[in-house]
Amino acid sequence: MKFFQEKISIKETNILLKVDNPKFFKMAKNTIINERLNLENYIFRNPIFLTSYSPVEVPDNVPEIVKLMAEAGFNADVGPMAAVAGTFSQLIVENLIENDCKNAISENGGDICLKCENDTTVGLYAGNSSLSGNLGFKLKKEKMKNGYGICTSSGTVGHSVSLGNADSVTVFSKSAIIADAAATSIGNFAVGIAVDAINNCLEKAENISKIDGVFVVIGEHAGKIGKIPQLIKTDKKEVLGNVFELV
């Protein structure tokens, strides 16, 4: 399967998109523009939606993107903006699927939604940990038939807010929106020495619904809970989201 790749940057939204036909790039850009407009207009009238670190209630008549982010915030007990990157990845892939795209991978700062017709490996990036670039998650094609979310939060890498010190907290869910908010929430509990911090994260993960599993890396230590894809060895030193192999 040949993939076409393009980086799409519109204001703060920076997407790495891989698709099986370049015609889908324009559709993805239109999705970003339209959904950003919906979100920005709502935030202009309701600035608390942008700044809150706690869940925010919204009325029934809000744009779908606002509703989805708010629901994810309540599910993980974080502010709605904790789900923003995963939300754009998911909405892009959903729109492409509706337009008969068979293979699409949307990555937004480590927050991924993908739908592939073949088994696919997504590489792990966990900062300076020795596990970074040496492990990957092998997803079965059946898992991705309607799209699947893999989202990562880090307290040591990137500009996103995390109150913990995990090198990576990767969450797996049918929804990248749910996974993104959950990764942020779980990552906030990565406090203390490595083993204790990992246990704190896994205990928090037990209380979050709608997720399949979680994989946490702090330094040379790792832990998991729930069902995660098969771990395989990889030698690619690349950012999570940049390592995609169809097998």
From Swiss-Prot:
<dbReference type="InterPro" id="IPR003374">
    <property type="entry name" value="ApbE-like_sf"/>
</dbReference>
<dbReference type="InterPro" id="IPR007183">
    <property type="entry name" value="UPF0280"/>
</dbReference>
<comment type="similarity">
    <text>Belongs to the UPF0280 family.</text>
</comment>
<protein>
    <recommendedName>
        <fullName>UPF0280 protein MmarC6_1437</fullName>
    </recommendedName>
</protein>
<dbReference type="InterPro" id="IPR037456">
    <property type="entry name" value="MA1715-like"/>
</dbReference>
